[in-house]
Amino acid sequence: MAIELNVGRKVTVTVPGSSANLGPGFDTLGLALSVYDTVEVEIIPSGLEVEVFGEGQGEVPLDGSHLVVKAIRAGLKAADAEVPGLRVVCHNNIPQSRGLGSSAAAAVAGVAAANGLADFPLTQEQIVQLSSAFEGHPDNAAASVLGGAVVSWTNLSIDGKSQPQYAAVPLEVQDNIRATALVPNFHASTEAVRRVLPTEVTHIDARFNVSRVAVMIVALQQRPDLLWEGTRDRLHQPYRAEVLPVTSEWVNRLRNRGYAAYLSGAGPTAMVLSTEPIPDKVLEDARESGIKVLELEVAGPVKVEVNQP
């Protein structure tokens, strides 16, 4: 029998955004970034109250279909707990549908909130599994759960009927690596951007990406001078260029100047990893083009603060 949690118990969750793929690591590599959503969840006597401030305000649903609410319920079920009612207040800073892990952060925030409400019965591995299930791939969610960089993977069931299993391991990241996000003023649909990908790739391109993923792991951990080489890709970015021409232009422009630029997730954000600040002139050119610039650091894991009644 599920345990009913006490009215008045409240948690505050701070969850980082993330960048997925990092060039060659399609649906595998992720990096937590210092742009955060904060979610306050309180157990109330009955009903559901949802408020959203910041990114997505006036656009996202304010009922049980909100991703944070769905993730809270999934987390409570996994924790064998139930509540009479919930108040959920979201303060969003992660740009939505821009390739910065906003939906994964929402899923992580919900599951982590449920874990805090239930007095933390879930492991990090379970939180990665539950939150990744909403995405269908673990790279963004695992980065937000574990912090830093992650290598993630998916095991599909043999019979095709069981839930895929998601897992990840963290990577140490050199302290001097920073991220600069160039965020265009339009959304990108992950589903639409995935549709342009081919169903098959050549052995040469697969081999190219396998080697660059290995280089990228070394670059993050100990050789940041290899970031440019480690962000090269042949599996997804060349195909997505046709539907994200603005991003592709900026990625190419930056790479031609020696910067480790790549398409962040499904875009449209262009991300640069570096050990030195990007010159002001480059960033000013981006801003004059209507692009928002976020100068970020590698972030730590999701945090949960419990406020007892």
From Swiss-Prot:
What is the name of this protein?
A: Homoserine kinase
Q: Which cell locations does it reside in?
A: Cytoplasm
Hydrolase found in the keyword field:
no
Q: In which pathway does it act?
A: Amino-acid biosynthesis; L-threonine biosynthesis; L-threonine from L-aspartate: step 4/5
Annotated GO MF terms: ATP binding; homoserine kinase activity
The family classification in the record reads:
Belongs to the GHMP kinase family. Homoserine kinase subfamily.
Q: Which reaction does it catalyse?
A: L-homoserine + ATP = O-phospho-L-homoserine + ADP + H(+)
Q: Which PROSITE patterns match?
A: GHMP_KINASES_ATP
**Residues that, per the record, bind ATP:** P95, Q96, S97, R98, G99, L100, G101, S102, S103, A104, A105
The protein's UniProt keywords, in alphabetical order, are: Amino-acid biosynthesis, ATP-binding, Cytoplasm, Kinase, Nucleotide-binding, Threonine biosynthesis, Transferase
Output the GO biological process annotations, alphabetical, semicolon-separated.
threonine biosynthetic process
Question: Entry's InterPro entries?
Answer: GHMP_kinase_C_dom, GHMP_kinase_C_sf, GHMP_kinase_N_dom, GHMP_knse_ATP-bd_CS, Homoserine_kinase, Ribosomal_Su5_D2-typ_SF, Ribsml_uS5_D2-typ_fold_subgr
Q: What does it do? A: Catalyzes the ATP-dependent phosphorylation of L-homoserine to L-homoserine phosphate.
What is the E.C. number? Answer: 2.7.1.39
Check the record and name the HAMAP family matching this protein.
Homoser_kinase
The enzyme's main class, written as a single word, is transferase
SUPFAM superfamilies from the xrefs? GHMP Kinase, C-terminal domain (SSF55060), Ribosomal protein S5 domain 2-like (SSF54211)
